[in-house]
Amino acid sequence: MSAENSEVSNNGIVIIGAGLAGWHVIDAIRAKDKDIPITLITADSGDRYHKPMLTMAISQKKSAADLVRATGVDAAEAANIKLLANTQVTDVDASTQQLQLISALRSDPVYTNYATIGYDKLVLAMGAHPIFPKSLPEDLVWHVNHIERFGQLQEKLATGSQHVAIVGAGMVGTEIAEDLLKAGHQVTLIDLNDAPLSQMLPPKATSRIAQAVNSQGINFLGGYQVSAITRISDGKLQVSYEALASATDSSTAEPIEPLMVDHVIASTGLTVDDKLPTAAGVDFDRRTGIVVDAPTLRTSTANIYAIGDCMSINGVACRYVAPLRAQAATIADDILGHEHNGYEHKPPMIRLKNKAISVMVTGVPQAVGNWQVKTESEDELVMDLLGDNDAVSATVTIKAPAVPKG
């Protein structure tokens, strides 16, 4: 496949976002070109760390500093790039290929001046940010989508056993629940659905996950929604919740006693900020993110690419780590003018990182569909999701953990 344009002037390549996606692009470009100018812009320090470790680190007694593989400054020096840390992009002018910047420290009057920077090729690697429903005030709840917030929560939890409520029993929420339990905390996991992972798997599969979660000692509240969170006089949080209207007759339902907890973690999904994509004029889907051309990862605007959590391919958000290396290699080849075969998106294997139960999913799962049992026993369940012409579009394999030999 031919590259878009091999001409890159002194402005060089600008990457917005210093998460796994942004650094993967830098690694891929530097593997092919040691000298082309690269500028990395990030609202934080740009430190390199492996985000999936955040859901496993508290039980391992790892602090945020322990998870950092290289500081942003050291990584930038090693990669021969310019790092603009603690810097936010406020506007993209695609016609002039200019970005407007302001310091992320602008609460200090010293840092209120705007600056501009030009680009020849722009890579949007800005990720996605947590969704906070109205019932989950951002100033009262935590999220673990970023190492800085994780570090703040880890410091609070390191003082002793506490009661933590987690709202949302998807992959991340379910993993965090087990990690906190292993660390000695009391855990309540709340979800709108009757079982964890219900948005991607059928009830026959998720019921096994719910059983495993409960058997550990996690208090799973399925079929409930949080209605309010308030801080009370002793510093604890009062979590009010109610059964979903579809799950009970509200005329006969008895009031539910609120939970009293020390912390609340929101694990209620991710969304992509549309401000920069809109300014750049790129096609954008409010549900899935920046729309890209699958073989090249180019957006609809010339000289702009997207990668990672902020992008979508064929209407599907790409929010897994496994494909990042191949995506970055494609962008590197395309930017540098190298012939390449084009990126071929393959759904990654999804694995729940819980010890209480093994859950592995391949393909593109969805909760509702023609799921057929392939293998079923007390210790194992294998189901296939059949699509048109009975083609297998997804497979879930659930296994009970191996019993240690005594």
Which sequence ranges carry the predicted segments?
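Short beta-strand/turn micro-motifs composed of small residues
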Residues: 17, 42, 168, 191, ...
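Beta1-alpha1 glycine-rich phosphate/pyrophosphate-binding loop at the start
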Residues: 3-82, 179-200
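FAD-binding core/adjacent interface of flavoenzyme oxidoreductases
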Residues: 2-16, 69-163, 167, 239-255, ...
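Mid-to-C-terminal Rossmann-like scaffold of FAD/NAD(P)H-dependent oxidoreductases
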Residues: 3, 8-12, 310-405
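FAD-site-proximal beta/loop scaffold in flavoenzymes
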Residues: 139-161, 258-326, 330-333
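A Rossmann-like FAD-binding core segment of flavoenzymes
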Residues: 35-37, 78-108, 117, 183-292
